Amino acid sequence: MTAVSQSSGQEQRPEEVCVEFCDVEKSFGGEQKILDGINLRLPAGTTTAVVGESGSGKTTLLQLVNAVLRPDAGEVRVFGQPIPQDDLVSFRRGIGYAVQGAGLFPHLSNRENVELLAKLAGWSASRREARYLQLLAMMGLDEEVSDRYPHTISGGQQQRVGLCRAFMLQPRLLLLDEPFSAVDPITRIGIYQTFSEVKAREGVSSLLVTHDMREAARLADYLVILARGRVLQEGTVGDIIAAPADDYVQMLVKEQL
């Protein structure tokens, strides 16, 4: 199944859609709209990549899904339900978040970084330990990184620790904000492979935002091209290569694929 825009007319049961944007608009300070009339339906169990330059609105999309921001107009639904107005703590436990540069707390050990949200969620020490060791193994990390601090391990290891944290609470949905851009290209390829394997094993739906078309093509089942707060084109990689919607999309294809 692929993601479809609302205008396509394709019927999907609510439980098949992990995130839905319905006529969503967002602006800051009354200035130009950051998001302008976004309509998207993203299928559960897949990875959708939103590709765009800085300022295109792609990070704002993630912040709306995670309820860090609220839309000025329209609605965002997660697994068929409107984002709640209260009890956001429980809502966010179903969402994992991975960011550029891993976003680890420097004063916590790598283990403490990964286990923090589970501890706050009331998980027992034994449950946290079992899940932590499971993720460490899946991410290809040695236990010796556990009691070290983020600055004492490589950038690639930090990124893997950050992904462990994102997967810790067994989320249904994973939000990825350019999480691999801070590591070198060779290391990145290995992390791509590991991420894809763990995501498939965990059965997680994911929404990736990136400026890198090659990264999107490597990781995603479906692409959304965003510019100036509007969706320019959506489709599979093959669809977009075969028929770019405009000059900007054609430039992305020629320069990055």
Name each model feature, range by range.
Residues 66:
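Helix-to-loop junction immediately C-terminal to a conserved catalytic motif
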Residues 74-82, 91:
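Conserved ABC transporter NBD signature motif
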Residues 126-144, 196-197:
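Conserved ABC ATPase "signature" region
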Residues 149-153, 157:
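Conserved ABC ATPase signature
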Residues 170:
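Conserved catalytic motifs of ABC-family nucleotide-binding domains
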Residues 234-235:
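ABC ATPase "signature
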